[in-house]
Amino acid sequence: LRTGVVIFLLYFVVFLAVYPGFFVYDAQEEYLEVVTRSFTTHHPLFHVLMLGGIVQLVYKLTGSVNLGIAAYTLLQMAALSLIFRYFIWKLGEHGLRKRGQWILTLYLGICPPLVMFSLCSAKDGLFMGMLLIQVLLLLDLCEDVEAFWADRKKMLLFAVSAILMMLFRHNGCYAFL
C-alpha cells in the first residue's frame, strides 16, 4: 500500500499546481451530455455518466464545478495509484527486488505522460489502467492455467477489468479480443 500512497502523493504535488485537474477535450463534451441529458454514442456512456455524474453531484452539493472536477481527478489519481501499486507488487512476485520496486515507484510517480494521464479527465487513463491489469493477469494465466482458473479473485479481477476496459473506450472490445 505504501507504494500506492507514494505515487498518489507525487501526483498530488502536480495536482496542486494544475487544480482542479486537466478537464480537456472530450471531458467538456461528456459533462455537457450529462448536464443537458442529451446523450450520444460518440463517447462511451459509462465514462460519460461516471465523469458527469461525479462533477454534477459535487456541483449540486457545493455549487462549484471546479470542486466536482477536482473530486473526479482525485478519484482517478487514487485508482491509477492503486493499479500501479498492483503492477509493482506483481513484479515483486516475479523477482523485482525492493530497490527496483522503489525506483519503479518513483518513475511511475514522476514520469510526465503517466502523471498527465492520472490528472487528465479523459477516459484514456482509466482505460490504460484496466489494460495493464489485463496484461498482468494474462501473464499469470500463461504461467499456470490451472492455478489461474482455480483462483476466484483473479478470475473476478480479470472479468471486472475486462468489462471496464471495454466500457471506457469503444475500441476496448478490440483490445480485449
Identify the residue ranges that each predicted region occupies.
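Membrane-interface alpha helices of multi-pass inner-membrane proteins
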Residues: K154-R169
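Transmembrane-helix signature of polytopic, membrane-embedded enzymes
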Residues: R2, F87-I110, M128-G129, F148-R152
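Specific aromatic-rich, kink-prone transmembrane helix
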Residues: Y86, L126-E146, A162
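Transmembrane signal-anchor helices characteristic of membrane glycosylation enzymes that use polyprenol
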Residues: R2-F23
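Extracytoplasmic catalytic/substrate-binding loops of multi-pass membrane glycan-assembly enzymes
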Residues: V18-E30, S38-I54, G63
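Short helix- or helix-capping micro-motifs
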Residues: I7, Q101-P112, A162, M166
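Transmembrane-helix motifs of polytopic, lipid-linked glycan transferases
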Residues: A71-G95
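Short acidic/glycine- and proline-prone juxtamembrane loop motifs at membrane-interface regions
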Residues: L119-L126
